[in-house]
Regions:
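Amphipathic alpha-helical segments
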Residues: 1-18
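Ser/Thr-rich, low-complexity intrinsically disordered terminal regions
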Residues: 15-39, 43-51
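Short glycine-/aliphatic-rich beta-strand segments at the starts of folded cytosolic domains
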Residues: 50-58
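Short, internal acidic amphipathic alpha-helical interface segments
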Residues: 58-92
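Short, aliphatic-rich beta-strand segments
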Residues: 93-97
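Long, contiguous binding/interaction regions
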Residues: 111-112, 116-123
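Short, highly charged C-terminal tails/helix-capping segments
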Residues: 130-153
């Protein structure tokens, strides 16, 4: 088995998180409870790639997608560990953390950070997305709803 996949599975089991391995693949499916929502997640681990994606549990209505796309683009500027993305066709919003790594053992601290970051970022920026969808806020002003963005992290 691939070190990246094996280490990820061992880490998830050690901390007691439930996951489902997609049969005959290097994909793990799980959910992570953030402060505001529970986020469906996928982890792909096959050297040299390790990718974790968390998704908002609701879709962006078609009428709001351009404004949300601008919001996500503005939010992405300066992020160090991952990025937001949106599917224009169905309104799915996700955050992705990824690394390219040799097939060698992974430290738990790295796994912890790269697995938790996508859900944490969705938690931090979801209020701005909701302000656009519910209140008609514009992207530039919606960033003020994110404490992380205001702090410049």
């Amino acid at each position: 088995m691939d070190h990246l996949l094996n280490d990820t599975i061992e880490f998830l089991e050690k901390i007691g998180w439930h996951y489902r391995r997609e049969e005959d693949t290097n994909l793990l499916a799980l959910s992570l409870r953030g402060e505001k929502e529970t986020y469906p997640m996928l982890i792909y681990a096959k050297a040299p790639f390790w990718i974790c994606i968390a998704q908002l549990p609701w879709e962006i209505p078609d009428r709001n997608r351009l404004e949300v796309a601008e919001y996500l683009h503005r939010a992405n500027y300066g992020l160090l560990l991952g990025s937001f993305e949106m599917d224009y066709d169905n309104g799915d919003v996700r955050f992705r953390s990824a690394m390219v790594r040799e097939n060698r053992p992974m430290e738990e601290s790295i796994l912890d950070r790269y697995i938790k970051t996508p859900a944490a970022m969705l938690d931090q920026y979801a209020a701005g997305i909701q302000a656009i969808v519910r209140d008609g806020e514009i992207a530039r002003h919606a960033l003020e709803y994110s404490a992380v963005h205001r702090k410049g992290v």
